[in-house]
Each structure stands twice: as structure tokens, then as C-alpha cells.
């Protein structure tokens, strides 16, 4: 579904003269697009606008909400900074929830726009299984998951460890 959404945004932007950000002269509206699709089928779409233009913003957000009712979380942010980082930005919920649910081995994870999470859910699952296997846990260890993000790795190894401690510096990433 992410390619359909991405392509629709591109087509809609062209048809409605919505300009993409030009990094050199700092002009334009559309900055970046983040689409997350969980293995549960839930979809998060976050559009980063360079400047506030309520008419154009609502035009594209309404179009997405109507064209793709399957979007679980539709969000946007106005970011006029020199970089694209989101952690210090105020993300606005346009429609749905401000998170999507990911599920692996019966464990459920809430993923929000600022969560650190692997971009490929299927490969993340394989990576976590290998991580758990390589750890060779016997059930007596205390495991520290530094920069834990959503805590997926910590939770994966928790079944085979005495105790797991997740440490994260960015509260919104949890």
C-alpha cells in the first residue's frame, strides 16, 4: 500500500501545483513523507511540510483521508528547520490514532511517528530472532537494551533472561 500512497501524493501534488521543498532556496511546501506499514496491516502516514499553508495542507490531507480510508494514522508536521529531524517537532494528528500496532510472536508494540523502529517489519523479525539466538541466554542473565526505542529486542529476549532493562534517551521513541 505504501507505493500507492506515495504515487498518489506525487500525482496529487503535480495536479494541484503543490511544490516540493527546494533545499537550496528554502521554498516549497512538501518536505518529506514517512509511511510505515506494520505486519498487522496498520498504516501510518506522516507528511512533513516546510511551511504552514492551511489551504494546501488541508487539501492534500483531506485527499489522503478520503482516498485511503485504510490509513490507521494520518499525521503531519510543519518543519521550517534546516534539517528533517522530527524529535523536536510538534507532530499533529489529522485522522485516526497517533500510533500503529506491530505484532511479533504475540508481543504487541505501539509505534508512533518518533519511535525508532526498523523499516522492514519482516526483516526486523528475522533480525530479532537471530539476536536472541546469538545472545545464548540461559535464564540467569540481566540484559540491558541500550537505545531500546520501542523495546522490541528487549521484549524478544525477555523470555530467556532473568531480567531485561530497556534504556532510552528519547521519551517519544518509546
Question: Which residue stretches match the model-derived regions?
Answer:
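Rossmann-like S-adenosyl-L-methionine
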Residues: 56-58, 62-174
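Short, aliphatic-rich beta-strand segments
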Residues: 35, 41-50, 108-112
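Short, contiguous clusters of charged residues that form electrostatic/catalytic patches at enzyme active sites
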Residues: 7, 11, 28, 125-129, ...
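Core structural elements
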Residues: 27-39
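Active-site pocket-lining segments that scaffold enzyme catalytic pockets across diverse folds
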Residues: 52-54
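Extended interfacial segments that mediate partner engagement and assembly in macromolecular machines
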Residues: 1-19
Amino acid at each position: 500500500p505504501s507505493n500507492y500512497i506515495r504515487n498518489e501524493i506525487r500525482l496529487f501534488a503535480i495536479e494541484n501545483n503543490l511544490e516540493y521543498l527546494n533545499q537550496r532556496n528554502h521554498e516549497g511546501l512538501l518536505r518529506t513523507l514517512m509511511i510505515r506499514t506494520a505486519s498487522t496491516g496498520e498504516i501510518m502516514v506522516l507528511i512533513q511540510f516546510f511551511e504552514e499553508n492551511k489551504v494546501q495542507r488541508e487539501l492534500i490531507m483531506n485527499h489522503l483521508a478520503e482516498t485511503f480510508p485504510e490509513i490507521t494514522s494520518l499525521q503531519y508536521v510543519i518543519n521550517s528547520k534546516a534539517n528533517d529531524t522530527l524529535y523536536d517537532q510538534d507532530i499533529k494528528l489529522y485522522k485516526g490514532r497517533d500510533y500503529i500496532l506491530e505484532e511479533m510472536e504475540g508481543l504487541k508494540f505501539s509505534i508512533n511517528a518518533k519511535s525508532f523502529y526498523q523499516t522492514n517489519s519482516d526483516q526486523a523479525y528475522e533480525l530479532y530472532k537471530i539476536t536472541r539466538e546469538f545472545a545464548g541466554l540461559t535464564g540467569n542473565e540481566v540484559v540491558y537494551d541500550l537505545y531500546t526505542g520501542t523495546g522490541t529486542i528487549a521484549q524478544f529476549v525477555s523470555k530467556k533472561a532473568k531480567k531485561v532493562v530497556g534504556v532510552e534517551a528519547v521519551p517519544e521513541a518509546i
